[in-house]
């Protein structure tokens, strides 16, 4: 996954959708609900330069399930988009699915949101 794509996802989630989000780990005191992202790349890019990536956003709260579901709905309704990054590479983002994940802690709630990201190299 390119740095530009990570920066793009961060900008969409935090600036546009106003979701409390960080990549890989939350480093400050956590708000009531917050989200952390990570990714898994496919084996190799296709001949056309397209690489498909699974981007996982985990949401956590000690509050209500409803707060996580509201953020999930916001992501689901607003995340699908395409863009040309500053590098000239293209990116397409698609909502996949979501599921509640047991944490083993009765107070801590977790939701996993799966996105599919397609990166297209710019020919450079």
Could you tell me what each predicted segment is?
Residues 30-31, 66, 123:
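Residues that form or flank phosphate/diphosphate-binding pockets in enzymes
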Residues 48, 60-80:
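Extracellular/virion structural assembly segments
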Residues 54, 65-71, 86-92:
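Short C-terminal domain-edge/linker segments immediately following a structured domain
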Residues 33-35, 55, 113:
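A broad, low-specificity signal marking well-ordered, structured residues that form hydrophobic/aromatic
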Residues 1-11, 40-52, 91-124:
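Short, charged interaction patches at domain edges and termini
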Residues 52-59:
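Active-site-adjacent structural patch at catalytic or cofactor/ligand-binding sites
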Residues 1-45, 73, 77, 82-87:
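Small/polar-rich, solvent-exposed N-terminal microdomains that initiate assembly or binding
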